[in-house]
C-alpha cells in the first residue's frame, strides 16, 4: 500500500511539473540567469539548488530536471553567461575600424565587460564579486583556466590586429596590445582597491 501511495504522489508531482514546464518555455534560461545572479551575490559554494528554485519560483526538482548536478549548472552558467559577456561586442569590432579615438575611449577589458553585464541592482564591490566568481569557477571546472587563458589571448590578438590596422609597426602593435590589456586590467584592479 505504501509503494502505491508513493507512486500516486510521484505521478501527481510529475503531472504538475509537466504542466508547469509547458507554461514556462524559458525555464532553463531563467534558471541560468538566476543561478548566475546568485553565484555573483552569494557565491557558488553558498548557492544551493533550493536557492535557485526559489529564485525561479519552481521546485528543486524542476531545477534538477535541467541540471542534475551543481557542476552542470555552473558549467552552463560559465559557458552561456560568463564567457559570452566577456567577449568583445560587434559594435567594438566595427568601431575599431571606423573611429580609432572613440574605440580607445570606449574599450573595456573582459573584466569590465562582465562587471558591466551584472544585474544593475547588485550592491558592494563588483570586482570582488567577479574575482570570487572566477576563483570558484576555477575550482568547479577543470577546463576553466584554459578557457580563460584563451579569452585573454583572443583579446590580445584583437588589440594587436587593431593596432596593426592603424599602421602601428608590428613590434609596436604587440607591445600596444599587451600594454592596453594590462593597463585596462590594472585600472580595473586599482578601482577595486580604491573602493575598499
Region annotations inferred by a language model:
Residues 79-86:
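Short, basic, alpha-helical segments at the C-terminal edge of helix-turn-helix-like DNA-binding modules
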Residues 113-117, 132-143, 157, 161, ...:
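Amphipathic C-terminal alpha-helical segment
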Residues 1-26:
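N-terminal intrinsically disordered/low-complexity leader segments
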Residues 45-46, 167-172:
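Short, charged helix-capping/linker segments at alpha-helix termini
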Residues 30, 34, 38-77:
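Helix-turn-helix
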Residues 30, 34-41, 88, 129-133, ...:
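Solvent-exposed, amphipathic alpha-helical segments
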Amino acid at each position: 500500500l505504501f509503494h502505491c501511495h508513493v507512486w500516486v504522489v510521484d505521478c501527481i508531482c510529475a503531472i504538475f511539473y509537466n504542466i508547469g514546464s509547458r507554461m514556462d518555455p524559458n525555464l532553463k534560461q531563467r534558471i541560468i540567469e538566476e543561478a548566475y545572479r546568485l553565484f555573483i551575490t552569494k557565491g557558488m559554494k553558498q548557492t544551493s539548488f533550493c536557492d535557485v528554485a526559489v529564485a525561479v519560483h519552481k521546485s528543486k526538482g524542476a531545477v534538477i530536471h535541467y541540471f542534475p548536478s551543481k557542476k552542470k549548472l555552473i558549467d552552463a552558467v560559465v559557458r552561456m553567461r560568463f564567457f559570452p559577456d566577456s567577449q568583445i561586442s560587434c559594435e567594438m569590432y566595427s568601431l575599431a575600424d571606423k573611429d580609432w579615438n572613440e574605440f580607445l575611449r570606449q574599450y573595456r577589458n573582459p573584466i569590465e565587460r562582465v562587471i558591466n553585464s551584472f544585474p544593475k541592482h547588485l550592491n558592494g564591490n563588483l570586482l570582488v564579486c567577479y574575482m570570487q566568481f572566477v576563483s570558484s569557477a576555477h575550482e568547479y571546472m577543470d577546463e576553466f583556466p584554459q578557457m580563460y587563458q584563451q579569452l585573454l589571448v583572443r583579446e590580445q590578438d584583437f588589440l594587436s590586429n587593431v593596432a596593426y590596422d592603424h599602421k602601428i609597426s608590428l613590434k609596436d602593435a604587440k607591445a600596444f596590445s599587451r600594454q592596453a590589456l594590462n593597463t585596462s586590467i590594472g585600472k580595473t584592479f586599482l578601482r577595486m582597491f580604491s573602493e575598499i
